[in-house]
Amino acid sequence: MQDDDDSILQDSDLQVSYFQEEREAFVNNCKVQLLNSIIGDEFIDGEISRTEIIVKEMFKRGREAVMSALMDIYLEYFSEQDIHVLKGVLELLSVLPYEDVRPSGQIMALGVMRHKNKYVIKKGIQLYERWNSKEGIKIIKTLHFEEMRFQKYAEQVIEYLERDGV
C-alpha cells in the first residue's frame, strides 16, 4: 500500500513540476512578445496601439501569465532612464479592467507615483482615473504628493470617482 501512495505522490509531483514549467514558458513567451511590441510601438493618447490589441488577446488566453509578464517588465525597466518601456506597461494596464489587473496593476500604479520622472507619476494617478473604479478612492486618499499639481490631480480623480466611478 505504501508503494502505491509513493507512486501517486511521485506522479503528482511530476504533474505539478510539468505544469510549473509550462506556465513559466508561457509567461516568458508573453514577456518577450510584450516587451518587443512595447519597444517597437508608439503610445499616443487617444489612439489604440498595436501592443494594446496584443495584450487584450493575450489576456483572454491567460490573465495571470500576462500580469506576471507585465510585472517582470515593470521591475526590469523601472529604474531605466528611458521611460518608453515603463510608459508602455502603464498604457497597457490602463486598457485592462481594474478588477482584472488586481492586485499587481494597483501595486505598479502605486509604485510609479514615487518615481523620479514627473510624466510617470502623472500616469500612475491617471491609471486610477482610467480604471474608473470606486475601489481606487480609498487608495488615492491615502497618498500625499510633494508637488501641488499632482496633489490637485489626485483630488480631482477622487472627486471624479466618487461622482462617476463604477
Question: How should each PLM-predicted stretch be described?
Answer:
Residues 31-37, 64-77, 99-114, 133-144, ...:
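Amphipathic alpha-helical scaffolding segments comprising HEAT/armadillo-like alpha-solenoid repeats
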Residues 41-52, 78-91:
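HEAT-repeat alpha-solenoid elements in large eukaryotic scaffold proteins
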Residues 115-120:
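Short coil/turn segments at helix-helix junctions and helix-capping linkers
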Residues 82-86, 121, 151-154:
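Residue-level detector of extended alpha-helical repeat arrays and alpha-solenoid scaffolds
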Residues 1-66:
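N-terminal alpha-helical scaffold/docking segments in eukaryotic complex subunits
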Residues 143-166:
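Long alpha-helical HEAT/HEAT-like repeat alpha-solenoid scaffolds in very large eukaryotic proteins
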